């Protein structure tokens, strides 16, 4: 039995008070949620403190909340911020736990079967278990997730029903407890004690929950009764205290009891017979043989071990679902009355829509060629309409909400005023004739004031030619193209901020992490060429790159003013007017954001002999590269321990680059 706490309150801890537009945005959002409104949009300009507003809303409505971001990096940033705002509540992190993932696939044209290959990040797996167990144990939970949250997960009912509940005084034999732990996929290992394992010493059983990384539990027996339960330091065995109740959650999310397993196996066998008959009728004897061999092996593993690699492909039978019925996901672990917040919704909702189709086409190939049963098609992400059916109340958060969000609700709450008093930049349009020389003059003016410039082009060739020309003119310039790896991109941004160079040229400057307060000029070339990066939303987002500097200015080079340009210019001018009026009324002088320049790169390129020396990895010999990989692994673990997953991911990418040279 799980002790589910329902009366905890969210407690927001912050040295800030709501300011600017934040108080009215918070009040409106909270009133609408408490009034039962299903969907609303928080349209917050860049740098207006949207995450703080979200935190205030969560603390006031006091509902379990799912925050979805469109990639792991942003989810990690949000997770860190919410952990700071809610240190006394359960802030959890749920993203894909794969460091590396090659999905199972088949390419008919070359008759190539690609087996599933993956590397699981143990730390993230722990955090996923922490998220699901927290949702079943308490009400004050915020889960920050990527779109992984719409992928199939085991049944929450089976997961909860499988919990092993222990108390001092409970009559249960030691052997019965050991069997119960094995049933929920715990592994006995008396030597290597890790998450998801237990060890036995006489009448003492030590259990290391899947959701922990440092603390384990020592269950002491007296005969066939639990005498006491202690929380201990897993590494040293030091006793931390006694507990009066312990709920051990399964070591995997795909878990089922013996009765359900027998039913599931019978259904898998029946489906196998059906599919074999179909293949034989069509003369597909190779496919039939392939399917029979693989499925019978999986059935044997399920019968003997209760688990097999790829068990998720049989989840429909395990869960007792009908064909085509949506899978259980993280959303099913939440209670009925919960809140969803979609960060950067103009990007995230598009991802949620697209996940199903990509997964379906790959799996159909596996089914058609006898690598999987048709029921594998039901191990999938949710369709968008299935996601919508889980929505009780939702807030879309974006500076530029998409068409989908605007179709869902007419309730749009604006947050335009920045706590720093910074204004949206001035935008002007200049003709393309003589644009490069004109831009050169603007760049030189910024260089004299120790300010930086972003230039965005539409083609790779234009970006390269422009970079070469400016270099010839004596400008310190770099070109950031799509092939640049994560770590190198971080290094480029850091060098730009430090003044190693003054101008950054790129095609897409909307990626996360490219917010540079030192940038006072954004130049948009070919602004009148309609497309993804030159539509209204793309232009507004690009203009926002100059909104962190009090001298922010945007120049669009174009021969005509398109509707997208005009709407972006009008919207920026509207916001700027509101911001100026607010500043004037309250006597606020805009101040450029002061943002610490974190030295990520020196961390990853440190060499043992000279701490601050940076090296070119290509110049290292094999032994030096091996030593560097060891150092990087240690630094990656240190970053993980302080929950800085963004840094950890960047160090990991650096490690992969070093390993690739061997």
Swiss-Prot record:
Residues 626-661 form the UVR domain. The keyword DNA repair applies. One of its GO terms (molecular function) is ATP binding. A motif (Beta-hairpin) lies at residues 97-120. It holds the Pfam family UvrB. Keywords: ATP-binding, Cytoplasm, DNA damage, DNA excision, DNA repair, Excision nuclease, Helicase, Hydrolase, Nucleotide-binding, SOS response. ATP binds at residues 44-51. One of its GO terms (biological process) is nucleotide-excision repair. One of its GO terms (cellular component) is cytoplasm. NCBIfam families: PRK05298.1 (NF003673), uvrb (TIGR00631). Belongs to the UvrB family. The UvrABC repair system catalyzes the recognition and processing of DNA lesions. A damage recognition complex composed of 2 UvrA and 2 UvrB subunits scans DNA for abnormalities. Upon binding of the UvrA(2)B(2) complex to a putative damaged site, the DNA wraps around one UvrB monomer. DNA wrap is dependent on ATP binding by UvrB and probably causes local melting of the DNA helix, facilitating insertion of UvrB beta-hairpin between the DNA strands. Then UvrB probes one DNA strand for the presence of a lesion. The beta-hairpin motif is involved in DNA binding. This is UvrABC system protein B. It comes from Streptococcus pneumoniae serotype 2 (strain D39 / NCTC 7466).
């Amino acid at each position: 039995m799980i002790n589910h706490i329902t009366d905890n309150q969210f407690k927001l801890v912050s040295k800030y008070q709501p300011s600017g537009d934040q108080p009215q945005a918070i009040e409106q959002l909270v009133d609408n949620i408490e009034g039962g409104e299903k969907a609303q949009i928080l349209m917050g300009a860049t740098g207006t403190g949207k995450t703080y507003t979200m935190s205030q809303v969560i603390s006031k409505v006091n509902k379990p909340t799912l925050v979805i971001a469109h990639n792991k990096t942003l989810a990690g940033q949000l997770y860190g911020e919410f952990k700071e705002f809610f240190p006394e509540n359960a802030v959890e992190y749920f993203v894909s736990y794969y460091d590396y993932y090659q999905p199972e696939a088949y390419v008919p044209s070359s008759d190539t079967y690609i087996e599933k290959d993956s590397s699981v990040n143990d730390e993230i797996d722990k955090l996923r278990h922490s998220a699901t167990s927290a949702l079943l144990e308490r009400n004050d939970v915020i889960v920050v997730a990527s779109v992984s949250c719409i992928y199939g997960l085991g049944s929450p009912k089976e997961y909860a029903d499988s919990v092993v509940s222990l108390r001092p005084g409970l009559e249960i034999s030691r052997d019965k407890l050991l069997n119960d732990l094995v049933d929920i996929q715990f592994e006995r290992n008396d030597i290597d004690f890790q998450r998801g394992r237990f060890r036995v010493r006489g009448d003492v059983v030590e259990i290391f929950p899947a959701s922990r990384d440092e603390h384990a539990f020592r269950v002491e027996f007296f005969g066939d009764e639990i005498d006491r339960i202690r929380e201990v330091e897993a590494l040293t065995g030091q006793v931390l205290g006694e507990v009066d109740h312990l709920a051990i959650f399964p070591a995997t999310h795909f878990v089922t009891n013996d009765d359900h397993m027998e039913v599931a196996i019978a259904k898998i066998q029946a489906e196998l017979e059906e599919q074999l008959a179909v293949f034989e009728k069509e003369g597909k004897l190779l496919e039939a043989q392939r399917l029979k061999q693989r499925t019978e092996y999986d059935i044997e593993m399920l019968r003997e071990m209760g688990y097999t690699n790829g068990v998720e492909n049989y989840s429909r039978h395990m869960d007792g679902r009908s064909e085509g019925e949506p899978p259980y996901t993280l959303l099913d672990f939440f209670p009925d009355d919960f809140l969803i917040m979609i960060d950067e919704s103009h990007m995230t909702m598009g991802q949620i829509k697209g996940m199903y189709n990509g997964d379906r086409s790959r799996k159909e190939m596996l089914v058609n060629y006898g690598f999987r049963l048709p029921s594998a098609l039901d191990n999938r992400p949710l369709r968008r309409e299935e996601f919508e059916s889980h929505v009780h109340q939702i807030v879309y958060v974006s500076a530029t909400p998409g068409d989908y969000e605007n179709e869902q609700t007419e309730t749009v709450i604006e947050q335009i005023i920045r706590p720093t008093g910074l204004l949206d930049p001035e935008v002007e349009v200049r003709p393309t004739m003589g644009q490069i020389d004109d831009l050169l003059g603007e760049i030189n003016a910024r260089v004299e004031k120790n300010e930086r410039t972003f230039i965005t082009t539409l083609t790779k060739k234009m970006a390269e030619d422009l970079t070469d020309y400016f270099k010839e003119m004596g400008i310190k310039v770099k070109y950031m193209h799509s092939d640049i790896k994560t770590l190198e991109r971080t290094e480029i941004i850091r060098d730009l901020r430090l003044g190693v160079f003054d101008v950054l040229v790129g095609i897409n400057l909307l990626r996360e992490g490219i917010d540079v307060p030192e940038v006072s000029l954004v130049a948009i070339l070919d602004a009148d060429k309609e497309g993804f990066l030159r539509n209204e939303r793309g232009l507004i987002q690009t203009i926002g790159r100059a909104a962190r500097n009090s001298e922010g200015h945007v120049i669009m080079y174009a021969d005509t003013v398109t509707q997208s340009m005009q709407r972006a210019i009008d919207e920026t001018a509207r916001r700027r007017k509101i911001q100026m009026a607010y500043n004037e009324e309250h006597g606020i002088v805009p101040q450029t954001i002061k943002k610490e320049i974190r030295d990520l790169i020196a961390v990853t390129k440190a060499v043992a002999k000279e701490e601050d020396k940076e090296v070119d990895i290509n110049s290292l010999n094999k032994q030096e590269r091996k030593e560097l990989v060891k150092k990087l692994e240690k630094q990656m673990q240190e970053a993980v321990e302080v929950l800085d997953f963004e840094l950890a991911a960047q160090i990991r990418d650096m490690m992969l680059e070093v390993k690739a040279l061997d």
